[in-house]
């Protein structure tokens, strides 16, 4: 279930037009992504900042890691989409909508990794958790009981 406490009001802080940031993907390839600005938010009295990808007037794409990465959520991080900031730069960060990247489900996907700036010293307990493939779950690994014959 969604946790309303993880719907947090953020503030979009724009960068100069045309700014990009290097993004490394899971296989080590680096590419430049449009970086229109960052989103700042507060949680438990601390201010956090996440660099965003996308276009300045559109939806923002966030690639982040937090203290649950590898401890309840996908180790390489999670993705989150946000609506475009309003005219005052306000944007709602709904961490309930944080999701695992495609590479969490298949080794055939390449995914961007969170840049160092987006590795948060915060445990985001909302959103998608670690995916366990049915063939690797403990139920699938345990032997099935068979009926014995007299």
Where are these regions (language model features)?
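Well-ordered beta-sheet/strand-loop patches within structured domains
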Residues: 12, 42-45, 54, 85, ...
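Extended, aromatic/histidine-rich regions of cofactor-dependent oxidoreductases associated
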Residues: 67-72, 81-85, 90-92, 96-150
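Surface-exposed beta-loop interaction hotspot
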Residues: 1-30
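Mid-length scaffold segments of soluble, non-membrane domains
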Residues: 23-75
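Residues that flank catalytic or metal-binding motifs in active/ligand-binding sites
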Residues: 4, 37, 58, 76, ...
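Beta-strand elements of well-folded, non-transmembrane domains
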Residues: 12-14, 43-45, 66, 97-99
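Generic beta-strand structural signal
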Residues: 4-6, 60, 89-91
